[in-house]
Structures are given as structure tokens and as C-alpha cells.
């Protein structure tokens, strides 16, 4: 009888400690860009900051949010008026501001043209290793490269006829990054 009582008490303690531990974890909430075009849910240990005035979210490790150019994630989309305000604007020259009819074929052609342009100017390797990946609901063209002296990935995609862009610098193999990338959602106004 004593064994049953002790076993029951031990089970109750284990159950209550488990429930307390589960209940104390705070769930991350999605962060949205200026005009709510981009939404991403940062994982534990990361902070997401919308960039004021345009559709971009920057994500940093919590302990490296200031003056950090070697560990970050940058997510870009077009503004509601169709303007591109990021690096993707220099790469996707076939996109016409304010339109929503850009395609993956056009994106591939723009990326191939950018690779040719860079090779002609002596830059080698940036757009040479193109692979297709899916993050969340979006198909992307991914490149492995070096940015600011560290390994990086660039992702170019098309959502609702507009280009989107993600760069992951220095965090490509870190815990939680994959979950954040798969949590990205876009709401492009047509």
C-alpha cells in the first residue's frame, strides 16, 4: 500500500513539473513589416525588427542585435505600390514597378543575366550554384555564397507576380533558422 501511495505521489510531482515547464515557454508571435506585406515568426534566441518605411524585416540573434553584419536574416518584398527597396531591385531588372505579372521564368532569366554580367566584370561564383528550394509555401532559387566574410544563402522567389528576397548571413546552420524561414508569409496587394 505504501508503495502505491509513494508511486502516486511521485507520478503527480512529475506530471505537475512537466506541466509547469510546458506552460512557462512563451510562444513567439509573428512580426510584420511596415505595411504588413511580410510576416515572420522569430524563434527563441532571435529578435525580428521591421525596417521603417519599406517592406523589410531584419532578424538577429538576441545577443548580437547591434552593429552586426555577420549574423542576420534579411527578408524583402515589394511595397504596396510595387517599389523595390533592396538588393533584389538591382538583380531583377525585368520586374516593372507596380506590376503583378512577374514570373519564375522571368526571375530565372534575370538571375542568369546577373550571373553573366558579374562574370564579364570579373566577379566569379556569386550566381553560379543555383538550386531550387521551397520554404513554407514559396518556391525559391537559392544561391550559396560568402557575404561579409561568412557563409550565406540568398533566396529569390516570386509571390503573386512580384519578386521576394531573403538573405541568411552567418546563420545558415543555426538552430531555429529553418523554422523561421518556413514561417515567412507574404500578403501582396494586387
Q: How would you describe each model-predicted region?
A:
Residues 6-10, 16-66, 168-190:
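N-terminal targeting sequences that direct proteins away from the cytosol to non-cytosolic compartments
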Residues 11, 96, 166:
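Generic anion/oxyanion-binding catalytic loop in active/binding sites
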Residues 1-5:
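Bacterial Sec-dependent N-terminal signal peptides
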Residues 61-152:
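Conserved polar/disulfide-associated segments of primarily extracytoplasmic proteins
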Residues 134-190:
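Short, well-structured beta-strand
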Amino acid at each position: 500500500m505504501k508503495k502505491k501511495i509513494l508511486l502516486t505521489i511521485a507520478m503527480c510531482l512529475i506530471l505537475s513539473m512537466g506541466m509547469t515547464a510546458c506552460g512557462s515557454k512563451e510562444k513567439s508571435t509573428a512580426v510584420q513589416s511596415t505595411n504588413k506585406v511580410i510576416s515572420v515568426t522569430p524563434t527563441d534566441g532571435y529578435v525580428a525588427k521591421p525596417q521603417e518605411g519599406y517592406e523589410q524585416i531584419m532578424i538577429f540573434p538576441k545577443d548580437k542585435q547591434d552593429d552586426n553584419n555577420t549574423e542576420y536574416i534579411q527578408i524583402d518584398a515589394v511595397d504596396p505600390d510595387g517599389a523595390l527597396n533592396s538588393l533584389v531591385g538591382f538583380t531583377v531588372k525585368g520586374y516593372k514597378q507596380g506590376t503583378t505579372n512577374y514570373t519564375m521564368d522571368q526571375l530565372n532569366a534575370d538571375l542568369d543575366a546577373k550571373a553573366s554580367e558579374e562574370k564579364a566584370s570579373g566577379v566569379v561564383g556569386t550566381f553560379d550554384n543555383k538550386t531550387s528550394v521551397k520554404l513554407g509555401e514559396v518556391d525559391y532559387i537559392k544561391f550559396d555564397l560568402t557575404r561579409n566574410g561568412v557563409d550565406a544563402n540568398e533566396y529569390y522567389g516570386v509571390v503573386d507576380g512580384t519578386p521576394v528576397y531573403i538573405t541568411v548571413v552567418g546563420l545558415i546552420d543555426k538552430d531555429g533558422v529553418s523554422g523561421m524561414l518556413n514561417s515567412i508569409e507574404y500578403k501582396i496587394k494586387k
